[in-house]
């Protein structure tokens, strides 16, 4: 769920996901359209695509389980759908960590009006 996603961002990227990524670029936050503004926004685009492939549960509200093993987040549990949600979140949080240097404050609360180009397919 979105609360867990925020926690994973904190664990993996060391950033406050709720504040930093809630409304960033064209894809971080609710919805998404246009072209990703930078590598950070592309993390959100890929995350949106990943959520779009999840079937049988709701990525925004269903909870999942994970643990940390040797410093890495490992998704667990018996429910394959919830495990898929966890993997989407884990990959996105890792992407945020790996692309911290591309985060540009000018894209914070960027607004959909700036994202009018045709969206690329997942």
UniProtKB/Swiss-Prot annotation:
One of its GO terms (cellular component) is extracellular region. It catalyses: a 1,2-diacyl-sn-glycero-3-phosphocholine + H2O = a 1-acyl-sn-glycero-3-phosphocholine + a fatty acid + H(+). InterPro entries: PLipase_A2, PLipase_A2_Asp_AS, PLipase_A2_dom, PLipase_A2_dom_sf, PLipase_A2_His_AS. One of its GO terms (molecular function) is calcium ion binding. It is found in: Secreted. Its EC number is 3.1.1.4. Binds 1 Ca(2+) ion. Expressed by the venom gland. Ca(2+) binds at residues 27, 29, 31, 48. The active site is at 47, 89. Inhibited by EDTA and p-bromophenacyl bromide (BPB). A motif (Antiplatelet activity) lies at residues 105-117. It is an enzyme of class 3 (hydrolase). Keywords: Calcium, Disulfide bond, Hemostasis impairing toxin, Hydrolase, Hypotensive agent, Lipid degradation, Lipid metabolism, Metal-binding, Platelet aggregation inhibiting toxin, Secreted, Toxin. Its cofactor is Ca(2+). PANTHER family: PHOSPHOLIPASE A2 FAMILY MEMBER, PHOSPHOLIPASE A2, MEMBRANE ASSOCIATED. Belongs to the phospholipase A2 family. Group II subfamily. D49 sub-subfamily. Negative results: does not show myotoxic activity. This is Acidic phospholipase A2 BpirPLA2-I.
């Amino acid at each position: 769920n979105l609360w867990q996603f925020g926690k994973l961002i904190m664990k993996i990227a060391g950033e406050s996901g709720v504040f930093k990524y809630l409304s960033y670029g064209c894809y971080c936050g609710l919805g998404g359209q246009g072209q990703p503004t930078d590598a950070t926004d592309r993390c959100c685009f890929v995350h949106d695509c990943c959520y779009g492939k999840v079937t049988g549960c709701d990525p925004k509200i269903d909870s999942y389980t994970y643990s940390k093993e040797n410093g890495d987040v490992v998704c667990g549990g018996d429910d394959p759908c919830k495990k898929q949600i966890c993997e989407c979140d884990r990959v996105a949080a890792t992407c945020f960590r790996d692309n911290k240097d591309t985060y540009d404050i000018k894209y914070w609360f960027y607004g959909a009006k700036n994202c009018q180009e045709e969206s690329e397919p997942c």
